[in-house]
């Protein structure tokens, strides 16, 4: 079965935060005019406390690279870039460079001064081009006018990991979740996409004994 059909059948959405349908993004880049196309893995991970990309790199880097290769092949892309958090680069460059040897993929170290905003897909495209690291006005969008104004696919580390699973028929609609801060069991966990926060906290033995409410997935719980 064609990879796009597999991705559609799996209902795969991006894991970078927007949950945009992966197949739609890939098809947009595929159908955009341009004699060159590019693929970027966004491994910026600038959100405080979030460590799922690092976990995937340490434990499933081969899968992530495989997902990028699948994207490169589908698009007939010129080059792929792993745009990586500088602290991760220092830990993982040797491992990743070994995995991407003799491929079209290049490891690109994010400037530590780029901060959180450096993870915006248009800002990272500017960075790779050697321009000022700031978001672009949109439209046009990166899918049609990205690196050097060519169609560019930007997906998160976890998205490429999932593409590899989908291709192998092993995708189970799960997601990596970071739990950290003032809790007994910090870590990165892998649970069903549809699990509620209460079930996740109980399953990881992190459910508070006090009354609380969750303000957002990236903020601490509030006591009352």
Give, region by region, the residue ranges found by the protein language model.
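A residue-level signal for beta-strand positions that form part of recognition/binding surfaces
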Residues: 36-38, 174-176, 211-212
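Iron-sulfur-cluster electron-transfer modules
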Residues: 1-133
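Short loop-to-beta-strand transition segments
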Residues: 25, 78-80, 205-218
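Eukaryotic mixed-charge, acidic/polar low-complexity intrinsically disordered regions
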Residues: 221-224
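Hydrophobic alpha-helical positions that pack around
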Residues: 89-193, 204-208
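Short amphipathic, charge-patterned alpha-helical segments
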Residues: 65-71, 192-208
């Amino acid at each position: 079965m064609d990879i796009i059909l597999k991705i559609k059948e799996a209902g795969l959405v991006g894991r970078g935060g927007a949950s945009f349908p992966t197949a739609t993004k890939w098809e947009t880049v595929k159908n955009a005019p341009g004699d060159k196309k590019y693929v970027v893995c966004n491994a910026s991970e600038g959100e405080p406390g979030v460590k799922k990309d690092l976990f995937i790199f340490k434990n499933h880097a081969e899968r992530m690279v495989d997902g990028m290769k699948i994207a490169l092949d589908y698009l007939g892309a010129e080059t792929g870039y792993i745009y990586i958090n500088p602290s991760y680069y220092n830990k993982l460059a040797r491992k990743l460079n070994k995995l991407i040897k003799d491929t079209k993929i290049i490891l690109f170290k994010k400037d530590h001064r780029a901060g959180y905003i450096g993870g915006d897909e248009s800002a990272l495209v500017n960075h790779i081009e050697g321009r000022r690291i700031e978001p672009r006005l949109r439209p046009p969008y990166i899918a049609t006018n990205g690196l050097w104004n060519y169609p560019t696919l930007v997906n998160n580390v976890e998205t490429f990991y999932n593409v590899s699973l989908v291709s192998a028929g092993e995708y189970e609609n799960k997601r990596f979740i970071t739990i950290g801060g003032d809790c007994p069991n910090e870590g990165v966990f892998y649970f069903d996409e549809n699990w509620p926060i209460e079930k996740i906290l109980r399953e990881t033995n992190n459910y508070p004994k006090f009354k609380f409410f969750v303000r957002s997935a990236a903020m601490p719980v509030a006591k009352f």
